[in-house]
């Protein structure tokens, strides 16, 4: 069953929101410019609202996709795709 949203965590020093935008542009569609709101960064990749929160949990950055319209069934599938493309440590 498809999840209503997806959230994964990427290891701190290994990736930034610009690398994430490049990956999401390929997977979901073109990313809008990132807008910083406090500690968070927001953009839209295709039709999917995206939130990037650096150091959300210790050394882990949160990537939150607010939609069920992604190519991934669940957090684990998204985490595997992120690992394959970005070559970074990922948790869900």
Go through each PLM region and give its residues.
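Short, hydrophobic/π-rich interface segment
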Residues: 69-91
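A common structural junction motif
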Residues: 25-32, 85-90
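Generic structural hydrophobic/aromatic packing signal, biased to beta-strands
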Residues: 8, 24, 50-52, 63, ...
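Short, extreme N-terminal segment that most often corresponds to the first beta-strand
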Residues: 1-25, 30
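Short, surface-exposed beta-edge/turn micro-motifs
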Residues: 4-7, 60, 87-88
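Structural motif
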Residues: 10-14, 66-69, 82
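Short, intrinsically disordered low-complexity segments
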Residues: 31-72
